[in-house]
A protein has these predicted regions:
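Flexible phosphate-sensing "switch/lid" loops adjacent to ATP/NTP-binding sites
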Residues: 1-295, 304-321, 327
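Compositionally biased, intrinsically disordered low-complexity regions used as flexible
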Residues: 171, 342-348
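Carboxylate/His-rich catalytic cores and anion/metal-binding grooves
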Residues: 297-299
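Intrinsic low-complexity/disordered segments
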Residues: 336, 348-349
Length: 358
């Protein structure tokens, strides 16, 4: 995108739920709602924050939605009485969903993330759809990037490449071979490790990318640029008409993020505070707002069920501000999140109103 290309990202989730709207936040994190009202995966929030774009229902597809669409078509008679099968009907619907964004003409590059793990039975139709799609699109029109983990054994002091070798082998057995392998790692990759992965996974050594742990997720694009991931991707896609990337604004954001001049403490009242992903967009908003104002935002998690009229002063002591997040559905709150949660949230709000009015 920094090179002037129009980019969007979509997420394919292998679970059978039609959308994440009814998933327990403890299991799946927050449900991210797009501008068109679609209830989607929380990753779409990351896509919007990183690219500065707006996503829609087309950016998030689940197995449940795929099957629902295919069954509806079968009930209408669209398949003319044919036996409906995973291949070709389910895989065709997956391919249609992948191609929809590209056919809009609004983008130069579509990044499609397939959730789950290679070898999961739920992921097999997606891998097969990718195999077919690569063949149909032709050479230079698509590429496959495989994200893998390199475990580090502290006792032995070495990185293990076997899991990566086996996952690539499993992908290849299903007809899909990665063009690029991105290795998540705690330790830097030596040339020997990269060469070993390249040899056993049948990719060029410059297509083995180190993705080391970063201080902030917003540092990752700069780390990927250092590994020349962008240049390799452009070559694989036969894209040659691009200017040099300008990441000045991005680097300025990171500089402010890492060098705050002040600190504020904000309380977050919620029901699912044990899992950070349950309130991911709120926490990321604090990061963005803090960096913009050169301020570090320290968030204090407060479980709404444990706030009472007797202890509210103690629970909210020393806070500069408060965000309250009780429920996520347009249902009677007491039924959805529990009356204790509602009462605790209201106690917190009343306390803040009184404090501000003094």
């Amino acid at each position: 995108q920094a090179r002037g290309l129009r980019v969007t990202i979509q997420k394919l989730d292998p679970y059978i739920n039609v959308d994440p709207g009814t998933l327990n936040p403890y299991e799946h994190g927050e449900c991210y709602v797009t501008d068109d009202g679609a209830e989607t995966d929380l990753d779409l929030g990351h896509y919007e924050r990183f690219l500065g774009i707006r996503t829609t229902q087309a950016n998030n597809v689940t197995t449940g939605r795929i099957y629902s669409t295919v069954i509806d078509k079968e009930r209408r008679g669209d398949y003319l009485g044919k036996t409906v099968q995973v291949i070709p009907h389910i895989t065709d619907e997956i391919k249609t969903r992948i191609l929809t964004l590209g056919q809009s003409g609004a983008y130069d590059v579509i990044i499609t993330e397939i959730g789950g793990t290679v070898g999961d039975i739920e992921s097999l139709p997606y891998v097969e759809a990718i195999r077919q799609l690569r063949l149909e699109l032709g050479e230079g029109q698509s590429m496959v990037l495989h994200l893998t983990l390199l475990p580090y054994l502290k006792a032995a002091g070495e990185l293990k490449t076997k899991p990566t070798q086996h996952s690539v082998k499993m992908m290849s057995e299903n007809g899909v071979h990665p063009d690029i392998i991105v290795c998540r790692t705690e330790q830097p990759l030596s040339k020997e490790i990269k060469a070993k992965i390249a040899l056993f996974c049948n990719v060029k050594i410059d297509a083995v990318i180190e993705a080391a742990d970063a201080k902030s997720i917003y540092e990752v694009p700069l780390l990927m640029q250092q590994e020349q991931l962008d240049i390799i991707c452009l070559k694989k896609l036969n894209i040659t008409w691009y200017p040099e990337p300008d990441l000045t604004i991005w680097k300025g954001f990171l500089d402010k993020l890492y060098n705050p001049t002040s600190t504020v403490t904000i309380g977050l009242i919620g029901k699912y505070i044990e899992l950070q992903d349950a309130y991911k967009s709120i926490l990321e908003a604090f990061i963005h707002a803090g960096a913009t104002n050169e301020c570090k935002v320290e968030v204090v998690d407060i479980h709404s069920e444990f706030i009472t009229a007797d202890n509210v002063d103690e629970k909210l002591q020393g806070l500069d501000g408060l965000v309250e997040r009780m429920g996520q559905k347009a249902l009677p709150l007491g039924r959805y999140v529990g009356q204790k949660t509602v009462d605790g949230g209201l106690n917190g709000i009343r306390h803040q109103v009184k404090t501000r009015n003094k």
